[in-house]
């Protein structure tokens, strides 16, 4: 039994904790409130990771970054957290495996592979690019061992995205939904359980370190098709979804910080956004969770929200 430390008790952090516990590992899950799954082998710790992380990672073999500052606080919240993760990885010797996303690639044409250069076209993309650049530089200098696991918009219980926040609740209620998207553009949706499986696989294989990996993800599905399938699985009326004008989102941003931050990321929903995850499937044998299964879990999470973490 070895100690694995997870920072962040959201859907990915919780799924990673459950997976490691089921494999008989010792797990320490850190979050500001000390929440998380109450299962055998998982120690729940309330801590400020920007200040206390090195103390909690002593003796760990792996450190998983599954946390994230509030969307509107990325520019101020991520730098100290990223620095704390690097310090903890260096002092403990634990391999640092970070939960990333696709923001750093910017707008691209065609499916996204791990070989794409980072060309962010948003403030949040620049933040993510610097986090990886700093971690990779420390890895190449021999100070730490690291890798990054990148997924697209999440499906799963408790996940937050344009689909789960703006579309799914209204579809389940039989109401018309609106989203800032090309409703028929293909879009990749990543299941949080698959993120956890990839994090654990990468941490365990030193051949996987020093590079990014894309989470095995089911074939792309447009927002319209996803909403329609969700309605069918939930036994709800046929989904009705319309495109939200860009101006409407900007106006909402005057009063809602999350909506304001979504504005610069609209390109991901208004154009094809497809993830190529074949490398991770080939390397680790991880097959993506079928979309129907991921949707059922997501629907269950909306209908029965978890307690605050």
Name each region found by the language model.
Residues 281, 289-309:
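Amphipathic terminal alpha-helices
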Residues 101, 133-158:
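Conserved beta-loop-beta element that borders a ligand/cofactor-binding pocket
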């Amino acid at each position: 039994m070895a100690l694995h430390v997870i920072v962040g008790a959201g859907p990915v952090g919780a799924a990673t904790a459950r997976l490691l516990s089921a494999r008989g590992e010792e797990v320490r899950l850190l979050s500001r409130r000390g929440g998380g799954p109450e299962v055998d082998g998982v120690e729940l710790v309330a801590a400020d990771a920007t200040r206390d992380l090195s103390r909690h990672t002593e003796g760990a073999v792996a450190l998983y970054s599954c946390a994230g500052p509030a969307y509107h606080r990325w520019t101020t919240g991520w730098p100290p957290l990223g620095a704390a993760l690097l310090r903890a990885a260096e002092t403990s010797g634990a391999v640092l495996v970070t939960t990333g996303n696709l923001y750093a690639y910017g707008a691209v044409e065609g499916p996204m592979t791990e070989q794409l250069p980072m060309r962010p076209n948003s403030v949040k993309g620049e933040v993510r690019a610097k986090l990886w650049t700093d971690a990779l530089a420390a890895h190449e200098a021999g100070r730490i061992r690291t890798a990054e696991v990148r997924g697209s918009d999440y499906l799963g219980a408790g996940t937050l995205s344009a689909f789960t926040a703006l579309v799914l609740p209204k579809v389940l209620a039989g109401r018309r939904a609106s989203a800032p998207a090309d409703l028929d553009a293909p879009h990749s949706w990543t299941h949080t359980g698959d993120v956890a499986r990839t994090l654990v696989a990468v941490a365990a294989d030193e051949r996987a370190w020093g590079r990014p990996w894309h989470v095995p993800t089911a074939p792309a599905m447009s927002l319209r098709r996803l909403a329609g399938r969700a309605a069918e699985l939930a036994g709800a009326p046929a989904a009705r979804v319309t495109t939200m004008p860009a101006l409407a989102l900007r106006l909402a941003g005057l009063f809602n910080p999350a909506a304001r931050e979504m504005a610069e990321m609209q390109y991901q929903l208004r154009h094809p956004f497809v993830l190529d995850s074949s490398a991770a499937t080939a390397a680790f044998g991880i097959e993506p969770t079928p979309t129907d299964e991921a949707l059922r879990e997501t629907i269950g999470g909306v209908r029965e929200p978890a307690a605050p973490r």
